[in-house]
Amino acid sequence: MLQDKGLSESEEAFRAPGPALGEASNTSTTNAPEPALATPGLSGAALSSPPGQGADVAAAAAAAAEQTIENIKVGLHEKELWKKFHEAGTEMIITKAGRRMFPSYKVKVTGMNPKTKYILLIDIVPADDHRYKFCDNKWMVAGKAEPAMPGRLYVHPDSPATGAHWMRQLVSFQKLKLTNNHLDPFGHIILNSMHKYQPRLHIVKADENNAFGSKNTAFCTHVFPETSFISVTSYQNHKITQLKIENNPFAKGFRGSDDSDLRVARLQSKEYPVISKSIMRQRLVSSQLSAKPDVSPLHSAHQALQHYQYENGAHMQFAAAEPQDLPLNTFPTQRDSSLFYHCLKRRDSARHLDLPCKRSYLETPSSVGDDHYFRSPPPYDQQMLSPSYCSEVTPREACMYSSSGPEIAGVSAVDDLPPPPLSCNMWTSVSPYTSYSVQTMETVPYQPFPAHFTATTVMPRLPTIAAQSAQPPGNAHFSVYNQLSQSQVRERGPSASFPRERGLPGMCERKPPSPHLNTANEFLYSQSFSLTRESSLQYHSGMGTVENWTDG
């Protein structure tokens, strides 16, 4: 008991064990000095006065001092809240940097001498010698407690102060912080995790030096059992977490940030809410389309910004310098996407037609009217399969594709041909080049091949298939030609030598092509349009070994 021990001149005196936590009746203790030691200043007067009179003065002074300490009453603020936490098992977070307690330790003090100065301080002592663990939704003893940390005292920042100051309002220790850093240099109270502790409040009468710790210091200690807690690094019991959320206004980490809700509320209350850039861009384009030709784009943009509809349905209007000159133009909520799509397509086509390489194709007027671009677009399947769509694109993109004019050497238009089926096995039926022998042919009829002997400046608009073949396309071309024309070899006349150069295709073009080879040319054009100049050279080197050649 603190009554049986005198206080030393250091703060170690407050580390003495207090009353047992189980004794609910002994919630406060007092310590009064000896009568003779309580009035050291009166010792000389007592010696000079009669013996009976000096003893009476000392006894009266000691009784007054003892009565003052005993009359101090302390009440715990928010006691009902503390009881709720205590019933669930109060937990207090401890961190390296220090964490404040919640509920905060606040008391109401009465019965002090208004003119006497007091010092209020708190220490936190172990409640028992056990270590705890939270298992099966309850706290259980896990073993023996770790050695206690050196005790620290938290002195209230207002100390020392008169009794009138302390009794004027609540005394709050909300700035007290708990830490598990054993080397903490900030004066926080050091605790061990998963241990049970009991806070204690000490009221000390200040001496003539406004300090405490002298041998004749009077003090009292108040303990509230409902303020005991278990120190943890994170909350273990969900009930404690819920109580913290419901009662702690600063528990943002658990409640969830309401900043987004507040931001939305402020946004709705603003006069000019923010709208997305994509919506404004579409409205500007549509306003330019609806504007007259003599109206400038800036004027149209101003009309679009003059009035708009926000997402929540409320109509907002920008302040205009001359509202009578700018008509109100409300933009509809549902916009036709086809209008925007065809407008961009027409503008891109016009930009491509301005190129020099397209001027030769502008002589023939397009059969498609301008009103075609303002109709709703056909479905996706029709766009991919409709031949009219292909014929529409061909003259406008003539720089990329071969030609939409007359047919070449009896070959039909490229757009009219169906796309060839692409397959990895399309060359399996063709004999390889190594098995082909030129000497087996007696005579080979010659027919013009514009793709080989003319300048390769025009290329058909068909996908290349050179990468999918197992052999060079030139070899396959020659094999196919052999298969199709071998039946006509013996029907030709006298043979001729084949000393032909690449620069003499004019002599061959005078002969009309046979209908059978026209069919072969159509097949060749549909299957091997990715032939390069290297394949053409291979073809000429192979044909140079033929002895007899006829012009038909």
UniProtKB/Swiss-Prot annotation:
The source's superkingdom equals Eukaryota
Q: Mind listing the GO biological process terms from this record?
A: angiogenesis; embryonic hindlimb morphogenesis; embryonic limb morphogenesis; embryonic lung development; limb morphogenesis; lung development; morphogenesis of an epithelium; positive regulation of DNA-templated transcription
Q: Where in the sequence does UniProt note compositional bias of the Basic and acidic residues kind?
A: 1-14
Which positions bear Phosphoserine?
A: S514
Where is it localised?
Nucleus
Q: Which residues form a coiled coil?
A: none
One Pfam family this chain carries? T-box
Where this protein primarily resides, as one coarse class?
A: nucleus
The record's region (Disordered) falls at: 1-50
The terms under GO molecular function for this entry are: DNA-binding transcription factor activity; RNA polymerase II cis-regulatory region sequence-specific DNA binding
Gene Ontology CC:
nucleus
The Swiss-Prot or TrEMBL record marks DNA binding at 76-256
Could you list this entry's UniProt keywords, alphabetically sorted.
Answer: Developmental protein, DNA-binding, Nucleus, Phosphoprotein, Transcription, Transcription regulation
The job of this chain, per UniProt, is described as: Transcriptional regulator that has an essential role in the organogenesis of lungs, pelvis, and hindlimbs.
Q: What is this protein called?
A: T-box transcription factor TBX4
Question: What is the phylogenetic placement of the source species in the record?
Answer: Eukaryota, Metazoa, Chordata, Craniata, Vertebrata
Q: Gene encoding this polypeptide?
A: Tbx4
